[in-house]
Amino acid sequence: MTETGDQSHAPRPFRHTYRVRFDEAGVDGLVRASTLLRYVQDIAWVHSERLGFDRAWYAERGVAWLVRAAEVAILGRIPMGASIELTTDVVGHRKVWARRRSEAFLDGEVVGWIHTDWVLVDRRGTLARIPPEIDAAFPNPIADFQVGRVELAEVASQPAVEHSFRVRRHELDPNGHVNNAAYVDWLEESIPDESVVRHVPRRYRLEYAAAAGPGDELVATAWPDGSSWSQRLRLGTGGELIRARLEV
């Protein structure tokens, strides 16, 4: 067992620097939104490990965090090769879930922010109460907000874009299901208007209803809503996975 010890000296928010690699940028030379979400996953783990809560700690107790909702706002241009300072902090919680907020800084300016709402589950996938050790190590208020939701209107009269595909092996993470950042890429791939996908500023909102697994056949339906786009992602057998929006 890894001891957490006295963490009263831990800085808030936690900070880490990331350099945007060549393969993390799009054809416009700017960081992908999914890259920012991957950075946020990584810094959350680094933060947790620094306070004594590594993967072994969670495995020993049979619990794990899963993302239930995410919001990614790109406010400025982040080019390939740039080094951004990313922050993370737990800004609110309830019995079984917590929200992290991250901000991305480039040359001292905020160029993006990300909210991730995490639920704690046990080995059966059932919601689990947050252990008191975590409450003590990550002091934060009882949330006066709800887990993120994405309400979608019915498909507009304009033609919807629909395509099907299968989950590829490289899209899986150590938990054995599709990494939550991959859904951001899939949302962008559903939108035929490149100017929407590359618009700055823009904001992504995703609600995760279920997780896709190895080899699953998926069906994505996307449609325009003014200058923004909505998407429903479901299994080929009909179960809903994701409700998402890209807003500009």
Task: Identify the role of each PLM range.
Residues E3-T4, H9-H16, A73-S157, Y208, ...:
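HotDog/MaoC-like acyl-thioester-processing domains
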Residues T2-V67, W113-H115, V121-R203:
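Hot-dog-fold acyl-thioester-processing enzymes
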